[in-house]
Amino acid sequence: MRKFSPVILLPLMALAQPASAQMENFKTGPVFNDFGATAPVQMTEPLAKDAQFKIAFDVSTAADPDKINRTIESAARFINMHVAAGVPEKNIHLAIVVHGGAAFDLTSPEFF
């Protein structure tokens, strides 16, 4: 087994620190308050107030146990991010296609 020099690991540890510190900048809302957290982004070009979004999300991989499906959370994040940027919620239309192992993320044993 190869041993890694601490000198090699130091830059990796330095990169991980800012990433974890940035997580505190993420917040949920304005549409979904329990998931779909976003971080503020400095926009160089504002989004048009009448912009229409029609996006499809393909969800086939099951979530980790006791966690929300990452792709479904990405869809919630997409909505939160754009509404926070000023796009009216009524102008955002998502199709979330769920199949394969991800189908189990939509049900629970209590459902049956």
Q: For each of these PLM feature ranges, what is it?
A:
Residues 1-4:
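Positively charged n-region of N-terminal signal peptides that target proteins for export
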Residues 16-23:
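Boundary at the C-terminal end of the N-terminal hydrophobic targeting segment
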Residues 88-107:
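Acidic helix-start/capping segments at beta-turn-to-alpha-helix junctions
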Residues 7-16:
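Bacterial N-terminal signal peptides
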Residues 68-87:
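Histidine-anchored nucleotide/phosphate-binding helix
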Residues 62, 84, 88-91:
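Surface-exposed, polar/charged faces of alpha-helical domains
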Residues 30-53:
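N-terminal targeting signals for Sec/Tat export/insertion, comprising classic cleavable signal peptides
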Residues 48-64:
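Acidic/histidine-rich, surface-exposed loop or edge segments in extracytoplasmic proteins
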